[in-house]
Amino acid sequence: MHAQPLRVLTLLVRHGTEKYPTAWQDLRAMFARQMPDVAHRMLVIDNSLPVGHGSDLDRGVELIGASNEDWEFSAWDRGINHTGAKLHHYDLVHLATSAFAASASDHLKLIDGGSLRSLLGFQGALGCIDSRREAFSIFGIGSQAWLRSSFILMTPRQLSSLGSLVSVGRDAPIFSGNPRQPFREDAPISQAYQQFLLHWLTGDGDGEEVIWHSRFDLTPETLPFFESKARAILNELMLTNRLLANGCALVDMTWLAQKVRAASSESEIDIPDWRVQISSRARVKRTLIQKLRRWLSKHMPRQR
């Protein structure tokens, strides 16, 4: 007797097709290649198109327009509202952006149908856990780790429990309107994280901290973009904080893939602290390096 195929709905946000022209095709190909037993449908939400737009891109792939007011978060809200009660016809909902494979995406190669099926047994959301060395606070909530918003899977019930995915709107008391000191003195963001955002988005690359691939100078002209991008980052963090507040654990994709492949079908998998989960990446890296060294020692001629 065959098990019913897992039903997954992807809500893929894009802003036009100039930067990632084949994003939805690449994502669908990944599902077909790595998860052929999954019944996959996709709703592409383009926040460069008017809200009333609607068309079909392909069989099982629908396109709608959305507001770009809060980037992917307001677009996801639009997609959820468009889907309506049909959202609960799926086993998992997949939040993604067109940049899902743009940065450090090796973990995506590990996801398969077994990982998705095991997720159904958890009270958790699956993605790539990012973290900072030092804890910080936003809106009085301590944070140190979060799920990268470009690729997250969870159950429809978990998603619906969040309501709107826009946690930090334009009226949030954060920004001063002054490019020389863009944050209000009473902004509900720790000073260290304010400095991180400034350096990440507008830094010159000096020092140990890395900077954003599209960094820019902060001027009166670029201030609105800075505020929008900073709010998007804060919305990403708050999405994780709200999931945690609802009792939904963070599940790292690399960790889960390793556990599923190592466990027997009868064994249960407990979700450990995020620090334990991300340490598995270091083990994977060490294993790959060891394999490379063994191959080189076997195939490369020795120096005399």
Regions found by a protein language model. Give the residues of each.
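ER/Golgi luminal nucleotide-sugar-dependent glycosyltransferases, focusing on the catalytic module
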Residues: 1-304
